Amino acid sequence: MWQFAQATTGLADACLELGIPVTGGNVSFYNQTGENAISPTPVVGVLGVINNVEHRTPMAWAGDGDLIYILGDTADEFAGSEWAHLQGHLGGLPPKVDLPAERLLSEIMVAASHEGMITAAHDVSDGGVGVAVTEMALRANIGARFWIPENIDPFVFLFSESTARAIAVIPGTEELRFSEMCAARGMRATRFGVVDSGLGVNSGHPGEQVIV
């Protein structure tokens, strides 16, 4: 029960910081089996409005040569992650919650979308960057080339579920404007891939690459 109470307190803190209304929710303590408590994960409903649905940002990338960025900082945080679940691993650090950074990320993504800079985007909360780009490639049926940024362990980069991060795909013509906007707001933006339908797009990166 303590874990559940802490989870709802965290939800309240996040709603206040981000200005998000919760329209409904559900949890049943009658689902407890024997001595095993239910997971402290309430289900909540949140309503969002897009003023013009034609301006929505899809998950699937489309343009050959479009640049793939990861926004935010990645840390060695695997407790409670999909990797930990699949490996049956207990231990390590859970992703640290940074609500001001989450708000900043949301503001940047919305602003960039309104300005027509972003052609696709995806969260990395369910499996990390590696899972996210695979889902984007499968949705688009178009591959891409990737490289691991310097000064970070490849495993951490691909599978960490650090918060306040998102993948943004932009046309090459928007790279300068997008980078300057992120820098001006204090958001790290790291280019780590390029969309490649198989025509041999030059990634512009000399290091070892992975093709998805």
Regions inferred by a protein language model and the residue ranges of each:
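Glycine-/charge-enriched secondary-structure boundary and capping motifs
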Residues: F4-L18, T23, V27-P42, G91, ...
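A general structural motif
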Residues: G48-N51, K96-S106, F146-I152
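Mobile "lid/hinge" segments at catalytic clefts and subdomain interfaces of large enzymes
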Residues: M1-F4, A12, L16-L18, I38-V97, ...
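Short C-terminal domain-edge/linker segments immediately following a structured domain
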Residues: D76, L99-E102, S197-G200
